[in-house]
């Protein structure tokens, strides 16, 4: 995994505070599944059926580049306005599923297709300080959540990979209030609504007998 993050802050610019930054993250994995003669000994490869006990290989990679900027504007002591914008460029690639064919004594390879996504994520929030101890706020934000590698490319005995899994996209609306009594007592109340597209769910699939066949995100 490679993760590079950098940001710059411009503070007190004509009642504005601005933060801008960049984030780059690249992940990759390779999963090798082997048959063992002794499950307690991870080196006890069973080569009677599979070469070196190796019966399956799964691998893949993701890359995400994000640029963002956020501004905090305080026109006076009673109001604060927060605006922000983020752009993500996400790509999944090099997905591969390799299994050993015991009939023909060979490895068969399935190459998963690539997927690229570009998403703009704005946000806006307004906060009003009614008194020194009471403030109310309203906010909207859009979020972009790519699935982890384990959901896209990794197989287990029960769970199948889903290389066609798309990132989640959500819009969140929230209103709330914060009240303080002295330095030890506070009350926070909020109500929010979230609308999600391409929500990732853990789904169980059954065979014709009603038994669990496999699970998938």
Segments (PLM) and residue ranges:
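Gram-negative outer-membrane beta-barrel proteins
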Residues: 26-34, 89-97, 114-118, 144-152, ...
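Membrane-embedded beta-barrel scaffold of Gram-negative outer-membrane proteins
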Residues: 129, 135-141, 145, 166-217
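Face-selective signature of the C-terminal outer-membrane beta-barrel domain
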Residues: 1-99, 129, 185-191
């Amino acid at each position: 995994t490679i993760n590079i993050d950098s940001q710059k802050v411009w503070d007190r610019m004509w009642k504005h505070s601005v933060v801008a930054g960049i984030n780059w993250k690249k992940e990759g994995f390779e999963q090798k599944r082997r048959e063992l003669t002794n499950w307690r000994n991870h080196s006890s490869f069973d080569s009677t059926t599979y070469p070196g006990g190796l019966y399956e290989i799964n691998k893949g990679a993701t890359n995400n580049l994000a640029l963002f900027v956020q501004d905090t504007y305080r026109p006076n002591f009673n109001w604060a306005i927060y605006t922000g914008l983020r752009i993500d460029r996400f790509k999944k690639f090099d997905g591969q599923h390799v299994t050993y064919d015991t009939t023909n004594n060979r490895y068969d390879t399935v190459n998963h297709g690539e997927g690229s996504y570009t998403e703009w994520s704005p946000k806006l929030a307004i906060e009003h300080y009614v008194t020194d101890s009471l403030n109310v706020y309203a906010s909207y934000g859009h979020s972009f959540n790519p699935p982890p590698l384990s959901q896209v490319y990794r197989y287990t005995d029960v769970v199948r990979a889903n290389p066609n899994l798309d990132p989640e996209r959500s819009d969140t609306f929230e209103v709330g209030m914060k009240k303080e009594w002295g330095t030890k007592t506070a009350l926070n109340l909020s109500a929010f609504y979230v609308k999600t597209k391409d929500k990732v769910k853990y789904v169980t699939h059954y065979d014709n007998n009603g038994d669990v066949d496999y699970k998938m995100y």
